[in-house]
């Protein structure tokens, strides 16, 4: 039962082959048995899950139907969940229980999903390895000595290990797509504004976006259907009609124009990953796609721009965690200034403190023009590069990551090396574009992903290309040994 995809579960529930409660109990037992090896969950919500599963079964018995009715999943631990700990992977929010549900959580609950728990993550979503969590590093089920990627590493590891069929993630600079690539999943970052950010604890407000993580494009389509849509509570939510993502999965790729940027194949890319990218291009050509080279001339400036903008926004967003209203509070402060200083110094981990300091520096009076304003200009140039490329092609294809998963601890003391792992993913966030990573092979037994990017609100196109690719390849069906 645990091997089933979300789509297979939907069919099984509709045909009454099993109940949601039966499935939920099987998966909760599996999590209890296997997750100690992975550390993919921060909180388990067994009682809530059984209650939701029983309610879903009752709704189905009353004649209701729906692809997500009774489907089990987990939420990344930065989505507010009413009455349940929402820690953001940080000591700062270790005891915080949200007073309300995030829009993503409430929309999926209305569709009948069953919440098994909250998944581990890099602290405040800052990281590419899921090593900065207050609750310990998450291990990659493909090799327990390796990282699963981040910051949605808990969601990625749990789905890859077949602890559950799908999970929510968030993506600020690749935090859905990069862990999806490193754990053999399909992960989608929607267009900025496609999915509500209300109740999603912010890292960088102009870059953050929630999305689905699952084993197949078909499953991502089902989950995105339940997540997407306008939300008046989110000022950045865009009132754009939500198409039927599943309906477009089987569209032929004949004549589809795929662009491969020449700048993607630079010195930092593992040549074995480059080879797998070229092989995936050949498969898509066999399906009728037309492949041509395009250029993204400002790609080289993306990482410096991103690591000014994201920390700048983080320094502002995280200023609310001061030990006064909620979250961690130091003991016996001498005065208000001491309360602020010690609560933040003790509550935040080193990577979060590093980014807050970088961001505050970039926003300071003497450096705002030189750093923050300059980074925003580069952001506009990157966006223009994509607009020019999409005038010639329908989809852009390239590697998701420059390297496969690395050993836990290997890059902990070298932040720059870790930041460079985001080279291919951050541009979609800077431009607000939708991006998808899909399984494309293995290097030394570790999964590798290929990334697809499309124009605004063309998530359906990305899912269609990935689904067609998954009809002629079997990378996405492979499971890690022992899980």
From Swiss-Prot:
Any one Gene Ontology cellular component term annotated for this protein: glutamyl-tRNA(Gln) amidotransferase complex
Q: What class of enzyme is it?
A: ligase
Statement: the UniProt record of this protein carries the keyword Ligase: yes
Chemical reaction(s) catalysed: L-glutamyl-tRNA(Gln) + L-glutamine + ATP + H2O = L-glutaminyl-tRNA(Gln) + L-glutamate + ADP + phosphate + H(+)
The positions flagged as active site in the entry are 76 (charge relay system), 151 (charge relay system), 175 (acyl-ester intermediate)
Write down the superkingdom of origin: Bacteria
Give a Pfam family name. Answer: Amidase
Keyword Transmembrane set for record: no
Which EC number(s) does the record attach to this protein?
Answer: 6.3.5.7
Q: Which GO annotations describe the biological process of this protein?
A: translation
Gene3D superfamilies listed in its UniProt record: Amidase signature (AS) domain
> What molecular function does GO assign, one term?
glutaminyl-tRNA synthase (glutamine-hydrolyzing) activity
Q: Report keywords, A-Z.
A: ATP-binding, Ligase, Nucleotide-binding, Protein biosynthesis
Tell me the subunit arrangement. Answer: Heterotrimer of A, B and C subunits.
Family note: Belongs to the amidase family. GatA subfamily.
Describe the function of this protein.
Allows the formation of correctly charged Gln-tRNA(Gln) through the transamidation of misacylated Glu-tRNA(Gln) in organisms which lack glutaminyl-tRNA synthetase. The reaction takes place in the presence of glutamine and ATP through an activated gamma-phospho-Glu-tRNA(Gln).
- Record-linked NCBIfam families: gatA
The molecule here is called Glutamyl-tRNA(Gln) amidotransferase subunit A
What is the organism of origin for this protein?
Pseudomonas syringae pv. tomato (strain ATCC BAA-871 / DC3000)
The encoding gene is gatA
């Amino acid at each position: 039962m645990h091997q089933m995809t979300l789509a297979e579960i939907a069919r099984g529930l509709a045909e009454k082959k099993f109940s949601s409660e039966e499935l939920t109990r099987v998966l909760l037992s599996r999590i209890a048995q296997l997750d100690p090896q992975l550390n993919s969950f921060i909180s388990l919500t067994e009682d809530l899950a059984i209650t939701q599963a029983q309610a879903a079964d009752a709704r189905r018995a009353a004649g209701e139907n729906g692809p997500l009715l009774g489907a089990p999943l987990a939420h990344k631990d930065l989505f507010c969940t009413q009455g349940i700990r929402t820690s953001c992977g940080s000591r700062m929010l270790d005891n915080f229980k949200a007073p309300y549900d995030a829009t993503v959580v409430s929309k999926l609950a209305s569709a009948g999903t069953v919440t098994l728990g909250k998944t581990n993550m890099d602290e405040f979503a800052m990281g590419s390895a899921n090593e900065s969590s207050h609750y310990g590093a998450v291990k990659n089920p493909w090799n327990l000595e390796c990282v699963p990627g981040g910051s949605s590493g808990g969601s990625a590891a749990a789905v890859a290990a077949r602890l559950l069929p799908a999970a929510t993630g968030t993506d600020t600079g690749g935090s859905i797509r990069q862990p999806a690539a490193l754990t053999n999943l399909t992960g989608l970052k929607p267009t900025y504004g496609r999915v509500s950010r209300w109740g999603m604890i912010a890292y960088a407000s102009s870059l953050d976006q929630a999305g689905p993580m699952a084993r197949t494009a078909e499953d991502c389509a089902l989950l995105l259907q339940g997540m997407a849509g306008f939300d008046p509570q989110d000022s950045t939510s865009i009132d754009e009609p939500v198409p039927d993502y599943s309906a477009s999965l089987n569209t032929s790729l004949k004549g589809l124009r795929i662009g491969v940027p020449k700048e993607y194949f630079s010195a930092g890319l593992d040549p074995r990953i480059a080879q797998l990218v070229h092989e995936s291009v050949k498969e898509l050509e066999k399906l009728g796609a037309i492949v041509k080279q395009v250029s993204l001339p400002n790609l080289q400036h993306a990482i410096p721009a991103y690591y000014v903008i994201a920390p700048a926004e983080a320094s502002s967003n995280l200023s609310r965690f001061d030990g006064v209203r909620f979250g961690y509070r130091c003991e016996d402060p001498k005065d208000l200034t001491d309360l602020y200083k010690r609560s933040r110094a003790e509550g935040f981990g080193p990577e979060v403190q590093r980014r807050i300091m970088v961001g505050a520096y970039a926003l300071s009076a003497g450096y705002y023009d030189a750093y923050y304003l300059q980074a925003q200009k580069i952001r506009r140039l990157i966006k223009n590069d994509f607009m020019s490329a999409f005038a010639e092609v329908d989809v852009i294809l390239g590697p998701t990551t420059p390297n496969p998963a690395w050993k836990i601890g290997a890059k902990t003391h070298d932040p720059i090396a870790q930041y460079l792992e985001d080279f291919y993913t951050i541009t979609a966030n800077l431009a607000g574009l939708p991006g998808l990573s899909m399984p494309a092979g293995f290097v030394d037994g570790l999964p590798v992903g290929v990334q697809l990017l499309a124009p605004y609100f063309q998530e359906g196109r990305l899912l269609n290309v990935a689904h067609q690719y998954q009809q002629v390849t079997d990378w996405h069906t492979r499971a890690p040994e022992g899980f």
